[in-house]
């Protein structure tokens, strides 16, 4: 990278500053003709490539991007009037470049608005005054004590009444539970009695069935004997008839 060349006129800014003594630095006016001629010489001698080189070295935009030095600025036209003199402070403020963070807008005045309501008193009023205003007819201490005793008595009566009602309801619930348990026990005993009766009836039927089986077997044996006897008698009769026929 080639080294950037800076004009000596840029480095030497003494031509832009007014030459005045120490006691006249704050109040003495400057010759407007000499200041205007020095600014014209600076604008004619300085070229744009040198400002571009300075901008590349500094890495930030310079005044070369915003000001055209080839034409005379109309904002400085009042400097051509020889009757107008400016102090050094006014000239410094005139030619100073505002920084990036500086605000270009005028700071608003902080005068109080005429429509703003006056500030209210933030001190809280006295507690006694509030109580007296809230209760204009305050009751004595004895009446409040009696009233609280009445409230306690009514509350006690209310609780006793509902305690009694809850006690009666609990007694009824327990009695109902006892009655239900007794009913279930009675039904259980009835079912047990019926079960035992059915078991006895079943055993009796089983016994009668066994007796009927035995009686049936006895009748079968008798019937077989009678059949055999009748068959033997019939055979005997047939034998006698055969003997008679052979004679």
From Swiss-Prot:
Species name: Aspergillus carbonarius (strain ITEM 5010)
Renumbered residue ranges of the record's region Disordered: 1-48, 100-143
InterPro entries: AP-1, bZIP, bZIP_sf
Gene name tied to this protein: otaR1
Name of protein: Transcription factor otaR1
Example GO molecular function: DNA-binding transcription factor activity, RNA polymerase II-specific
Highest taxon of the lineage: Eukaryota
Keywords linked to the UniProt accession: DNA-binding, Nucleus, Transcription, Transcription regulation
Record region (Basic motif): 156-196
Any single biological process term in GO: ochratoxin A biosynthetic process
